[in-house]
Amino acid sequence: MHYQLQQNALLPLLARTLSLNVFYNFVRDAFKAQALGWEIPSLCSVVKTMMGWNYARTAAVSRERCGGMGFLSSSRFAEYLACAHTCLTAEGDNRVLMHKIVKDLLGAVASKKHELPKPKLNVKAQIGSMDDVSSLEYLSDLFRFRLSTLCQQIVAKMAALNKQGMTDFEVAMMGTSDLIQDLAQAYGERRMLDSCVDFLGTLAGENRRVMEGVFRVAAIDCVKRDLGFYVREKAIKP
């Protein structure tokens, strides 16, 4: 782990795994309390997809980073990869679940059952002019900005395609599929980060400092993956 190659490949996966575990605990408690109404099926669906994909990616990348030892049965990577396959397909294909998540989200927003959380800062005017956006406060605002922006974009595109005569099925499967996947992921990752921030409130001292660093790494990795979106939308400086 002293090598930069290992750190850059494995530490973001570890940070995301820990963050997803906090998110899973939040969803489990919400399901038990049945306190979030319409959102419960969406939360259960999105945490299942996110943890399944993370499991598959972690197993694949970790096997590669172990080199030849990754082929040994004692390393158990074959077992992990087989289990990850189940995570991706059991109880509904993950990509199909993402469609359900967006359908429920857009329905809740349209019916006023749900209001998308707003960033605390003006993302384009303030965060978009900063040299360092790595604090949890700024990262949280960026996640919320991505969610609301994608939601606006997909609503506008769906309406335009409907006017062109496309059916709802054609719009979802042939016209806005990429946006649907991005929006569902943005919804899940925003919920994940919010649950991590809430969890930090229960910690103090060194525990809080360490876990804040973990959650920042997980969030920064998401922003790095979607950097093109943030630069295009002027939410981050080029």
Language-model region placement:
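Flavin-dependent oxidoreductase catalytic core characteristic
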Residues: 1-238
